[in-house]
Amino acid sequence: MTNEIKIANALLTEMQDINYGWVDFTGKTHLGDFDSFSDDYRLQSPASLQKSKAGVCWDQVEFERDYFKEHNISIKTYFLVYYNGKDCPTHTFLVFKSNGEFYWFEHSWERFRGLHQYQNIDELLSDVVHKFIKSEIKDGDFNSTNLNVHEYTQPNYGLSVQEFYAFCDNGTYIDISY
């Protein structure tokens, strides 16, 4: 087992007490209540997430980014969004490379929590996109022109939902074949 894999597994263990939820601009934690998310959400810093113990994938990826950076492991982060004119589901996730293999590190998406190994980045991205489509988009409603994938860099903390979308959409567009 490589050092990167050991560190990634240690992070999964460290994140066990972090729940899927969000913190609003007043500092109130919301678990399971997303009614005011689009108006009141603000992106947390890693220290804030560690304190609140609740974050959506956007917050959790920033915590993960910080952890991997502290351990000198190069990573990339990706933003998936399906612009359907309604709820516009999203997912962010982190990828790293170890010993020639690519790894999808996943904590927030509980169904797929863990480390997932791939031969190349295209295989990894395609798999995550297919899982996202199958899990988040109703059968028959999928239109590939509405799905966007961007690689993005570290955002400023405190961004609103709209600001976070705009930031990620300004990242590097990734063309994924379905």
Residue ranges of predicted features:
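A structural boundary/capping signal
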Residues: 1-178
